[in-house]
Each structure stands twice: as structure tokens, then as C-alpha cells.
Amino acid sequence: MVSISPDGELFTLVNVFTVEPENQQRLCDHLAQVTEDLIRHMPGFVSANFHLGHDGRHVVNYAQWRSEADFRAMHADPRLEEHFAFCRSVSQPRQISCDVARTFRGVGEGGN
């Protein structure tokens, strides 16, 4: 389960991939498959969530790792070179590392 909390000590990444509409689902499927087969088994991986922009031109990945060092180790793994090359070939990726500042839930969802 994804835990989004300003009290968490997780390393959070938001990846925004700008794509041509014909590549949106293709990229999302690729990201999901690589995550299922390899990334989720790596040390420090917590979660990944993929979102398709209604405009057909964006895939957004919200990912969490136990630490930035765990994320960097994944990124340096040579088994993922083809994955990153594919992503760059079908999209313009933008990676943003974040700290969770605030979260809110609806009153009907257990929030105040």
C-alpha cells in the first residue's frame, strides 16, 4: 500500500513522461512490465503508481523508495539500460524528486 505522508522518511519521485498519443499506453505498459519483472524486487523499492494523462500526451509515475541511495543503486543497475533507452526513445522524461509537504483526505474518507 502506498503511504503518502509528510511524516514518512521515504524518497519520493514524480516522473513525468511527455509522449505522442500513440505511445502513451505503450510506455505505460512497458513501465509496468519492467516494474513487475525487475524493479519491484530491488532493495529499497516501496511502490510505483502509473497515471495516464487525459490529454494522451503524458504518463506520470509516482514512485517511492526507502532512500535516495536505493533509488540511485537501481538507476545504476546495468540490467535497466535498455529500459531507460526505450523510455527516452518514446518520450521526453522529466524526473522530480520531492518531499511530501502536506496531505489531505476527504471528510468522508476518514479525514478531518
Where does each model-flagged region fall?
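Short, surface-exposed ligand-recognition loops at beta-strand->loop->(often short) alpha-helix junctions
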Residues: 18-31
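Short, flexible segments with low predicted structural confidence
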Residues: 10-11, 27, 42-43
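An amphipathic, aromatic/His-enriched active-site/gating alpha helix that lines ligand/cofactor pockets
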Residues: 33-46, 64-97
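Short acidic-aromatic low-complexity motifs
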Residues: 3, 21-22, 41-42
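Short, well-ordered beta-strand segments in beta-rich or mixed alpha/beta enzyme
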Residues: 11-18, 47-77
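Residue-level signal for secondary-structure boundary sites
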Residues: 23-25, 69-71, 106
